[in-house]
């Protein structure tokens, strides 16, 4: 009898230990899962960094709106037909969902940031094409405005696009069509422009899209230095005869943007068309 009780006690103790270990295991994974969920729900940080070498259709970090789609690992900002021919009057946007802390209200400090991406804009060998695309920083809740197709690049509408109106948007535009508010010189059209609070570029430089081979790969690098407050843009077409295009401006982001922003791409076509494809994208910011 004593031996039987001893075996029963050992079995019971072993079972209790097993249950305890399983309980700890489940509790650990529950906490880990909960922590992961909470961080996903509130993904705010002083530093953000990512690198996308190929776009995935089910990427939870990228939110697509309008006519933007992902196919064959490419982010296609505006609509095309089945043969890849661009369609008129389309508007598309892709937003990276994690908020970016671009400046701090308490300390007054500004963030440094840099981003790079490769892109292809196919003009179908026509000098008449449009409208363009832009990399932008904007408010957390920034919907696509109504009447923002064509030259408004899906970022502005006719009521808030021009000075003295100051929309809380910073954009680097790749503008393929000359509107009445664009640089007057034919040398500067198409152009790469820095838009600070309006669709009228504060600074701009020539975009050689009409002179590079069809489907040429462009590479853009955009950097912001918090000490000098200088935003610098470098665009090149490797393997072609064109040197890099450079444009920069001094801008205090505290006077333009809210503390927290989201980043992304926006693009449009009008009656004239072109493709707007982003091949890869990386970004890094630190406050």
Swiss-Prot record:
Gene Ontology terms for molecular function: carbohydrate binding
Homology family: Belongs to the leguminous lectin family.
Entry protein name: Lectin 10
Gene behind the chain: LEC10
Organism: Medicago truncatula (Barrel medic)
Keyword tags: Glycoprotein, Lectin, Membrane, Transmembrane, Transmembrane helix
Keyword match Oxidoreductase: no
Topological domains, Cytoplasmic: 1-11
Transmembrane segments: 12-31
């Amino acid at each position: 009898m004593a031996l039987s009780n001893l075996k029963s006690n050992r079995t019971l103790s072993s079972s209790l230990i097993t249950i305890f270990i399983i309980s700890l295991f489940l509790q650990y994974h529950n906490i880990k899962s909960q922590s992961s969920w909470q961080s996903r729900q509130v993904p705010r940080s002083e530093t953000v960094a990512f690198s996308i070498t190929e776009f995935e259709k089910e990427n939870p970090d990228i939110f697509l709106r309008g006519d933007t789609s992902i196919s064959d690992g490419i982010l296609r900002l505006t609509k095309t037909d089945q043969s890849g021919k661009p369609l008129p009057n389309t508007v598309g946007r892709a937003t990276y969902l994690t908020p970016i802390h671009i400046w701090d209200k308490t300390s007054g400090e500004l963030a440094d940031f840099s981003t790079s991406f490769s892109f292809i804009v196919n003009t179908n060998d026509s000098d008449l094409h449009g409208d363009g695309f832009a990399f932008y920083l904007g408010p957390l809740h920034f919907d696509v405005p109504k009447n923002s197709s064509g030259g408004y690049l899906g970022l502005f509408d006719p009521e808030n696009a021009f000075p003295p109106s100051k929309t809380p948007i910073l954009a680097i535009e790749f503008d393929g069509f000359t509107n009445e508010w664009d640089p007057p010189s034919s040398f500067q059209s198409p152009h790469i422009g820095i838009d600070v609070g309006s669709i009228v570029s504060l600074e701009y430089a020539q975009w050689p899209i009409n002179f590079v081979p069809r489907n040429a790969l462009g590479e853009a690098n955009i950097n912001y230095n918090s000490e000098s407050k200088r935003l610098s843009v470098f665009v090149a077409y490797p393997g072609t005869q064109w040197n890099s295009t450079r444009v920069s401006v001094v801008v205090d982001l505290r006077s333009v943007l809210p503390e927290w922003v989201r980043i992304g791409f926006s693009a449009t076509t009008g009656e004239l068309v072109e493709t707007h494809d982003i091949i890869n994208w990386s970004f890094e910011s630190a406050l």
